[in-house]
Swiss-Prot record:
GO-annotated cellular components: cytosol
Taxonomic source organism: Borrelia hermsii (strain HS1 / DAH)
Catalytic activity, EC: 2.1.1.228
Protein's cellular compartments: Cytoplasm
Gene3D superfamilies referenced in this protein's UniProt entry, alphabetically: 3.40.1280.10, tRNA(m1g37)methyltransferase, domain 2 (1.10.1270.20)
UniProt keywords, alphabetically: Cytoplasm, Methyltransferase, S-adenosyl-L-methionine, Transferase, tRNA processing
Similarity-based family: Belongs to the RNA methyltransferase TrmD family.
Catalytic activity: guanosine(37) in tRNA + S-adenosyl-L-methionine = N(1)-methylguanosine(37) in tRNA + S-adenosyl-L-homocysteine + H(+)
Chain sites annotated for binding S-adenosyl-L-methionine: 110, 130-135
Protein's UniProt keywords contain Transmembrane: no
Domain of life of the native organism: Bacteria
Protein known as: tRNA (guanine-N(1)-)-methyltransferase
GO BP terms in the entry: tRNA N1-guanine methylation
Role this protein plays: Specifically methylates guanosine-37 in various tRNAs.
Length: 239
């Protein structure tokens, strides 16, 4: 897979590909990347890429010409082009999986109040929000998408590890709690079942804890899980 990122601040993006597991994935040729500076395509002598919004209002808007020129440069219309925005489609593990099947992605990093709608209308295939909150940096949101996608590529992560993670496709539950040495820490001990060596009992304990954590922290996912297995615990609303 190749990922192209369009950004006003490329220096935020580049280090992500040069460290830890991502560097290994790049070195092994599983993923390639290109970071494009939008400012390089601005015809303004100061390389400005924003302007005041038509109709008035707070903040500045990213101008269409420099981003359009950058998108034409990378031939974006032949690839899956994403704009990260708080008004986009909510990002999920399923969407990450769908994107991992694409051969090339182009991600536009938003800034300021937003992007001229005409760029979205002309070039963007998918407008994506990484959560119900607002970030000052579209680069941060872009890295969330990149990190979640590359892990699903063949050869990047051990497949067995992916099956046990939160939001895995077999059940959609959050992941169970983890423990490592020491056995006792500040009066808290590792659950005995994890030391028992009984793999079926460990598997059962982890599943129960996974359900409990999902019900507590993500009741919406818990209800989806109940719907999937065709059961109801009698609750009509959160406790």
């Amino acid at each position: 897979m190749k990922i192209t990122i369009l950004s006003l601040f490329p220096s935020i993006i580049t280090p992500f590909f040069e460290n830890s597991i991502m560097k290994k994935v790049v070195d092994r040729g599983i993923i390639s990347y290109e970071v494009i500076s939008i400012r390089d395509f601005s015809d303004d002598k100061h390389k400005r890429c924003d302007d005041i919004p038509y109709g008035g209002g707070a903040g500045m808007v990213l101008k269409a010409p420099p981003i359009s020129a950058a998108l034409e440069y990378v031939n974006a219309k032949s690839k899956t082009t994403i704009f990260v925005s708080p008004s986009g489609l909510k990002y999920t593990q399923k969407l990450a999986y769908d994107l991992s099947k694409k051969s090339e992605l182009v991600i536009i990093c938003g800034r300021y109040e937003g992007l001229d709608q005409r760029v979205i209308d002309l070039y963007v295939d998918l407008e994506v929000s990484v959560g119900d909150y607002v970030l000052s940096s579209g680069e941060v949101a872009a890295l969330v998408i990149i990190d979640s996608v590359y892990r699903l590529l063949d050869g990047a992560i051990n497949p067995s590890s992916l099956l046990e993670e939160s939001f895995s496709f077999d059940c959609g539950l959050l992941e169970y709690p983890h423990y490592t040495r020491p056995y006792e820490f500040k009066g808290l001990e590792v659950p005995d079942v994890l030391l028992s060596g009984h793999h079926e009992e460990i598997k059962k304990w982890r599943f129960i804890k996974s359900v409990e954590k999902t019900k507590k922290n993500r009741y919406d996912l818990y209800l989806k899980y109940l719907e999937m297995i065709g059961e109801n615990d009698g609750f009509s609303k959160k406790n």
